[in-house]
Amino acid sequence: MKTLPLSLLFAACAALSACADEGPAEVELSAGEPFEGSASSGIAFGELTARPAVVVREIIVAGSISSSVAPGFDLDNRVSNATDREACGKKDFTSPEGTTGIDNQLGAVWASVYDLAGVPVEGLVRAAVNDGKLALVVELDGLDDPWNDDNVTLRLFRGYNEKPIIGTTGVMQGGQTFEVRPGAPVIVAENASIVDGRLRLSADDYYLELELLAEAFAINVINMVFELQYQEDGTWNGYLGCGVSVAEISDIARTYAESESRIIIPLLPNIADLRPGSDNKCTYVSAVLELKGIDAFVAR
């Protein structure tokens, strides 16, 4: 029995490579409060320039902490209760820091869904990350100070490294070099700043490519928020929140895992909380991924 569709539901937000009919494109994202400025620099090696970056080396689903507390973001700019039709009656969470309006309905059922998966989802995603298939890279063009820098251009994309070096702890080592994956569009935030070590990006609608196991899929991701926080030990921790399509995940389940579709398809409408349709039923499910990154370089 395949567990791929369950993994796609949890990891759809992580493969940030928007689909395009033609070659690479640059798409400007809206930037959150920490952003103001622009820069360009790097270290030249022959015809290539290596620029500082962060590569995400660990991705796990961020489950709820309790019935009312969960990590994540306010993806729909509203605080919903059980009577809110715009959220299809799904009550928002409060973050551990006390922020209200947190959308993370997948996290609320994560434990039960994890038990139903034949292969642990985290193991499947970790294998894809370590193989370089889910190399999520943030280029920090013009970075001078990872704690506070008012003149940085951010580029977010799926990176390419034929064989990343894996350390003794089972995750990618730092200091490795990545390229933009051939044909992958680059999402750009110019005039950006790092404030107190925090990066934050947001995007409304993107059609993303995701590759897990031997399958490649395109999934529509909405209301994406990406945030990383620099740490004293030189690593980066953060979250990625987004909405994933009920219809698309259901179609993938029917096609690639008929047995699992009997579990997945009835579950999704019951936790959907974003973008209600004409029938007042929500068409997307909010999800949050916890990210851990390490320093890297981008060669251009």
Name each model-derived stretch.
Residues E22-R300:
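Extracytosolic secretory-pathway proteins
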Residues A15-A18:
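C-terminal motif of bacterial Sec signal peptides marking the signal peptidase cleavage site
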Residues M1-L8:
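Bacterial N-terminal signal peptides that target proteins for export
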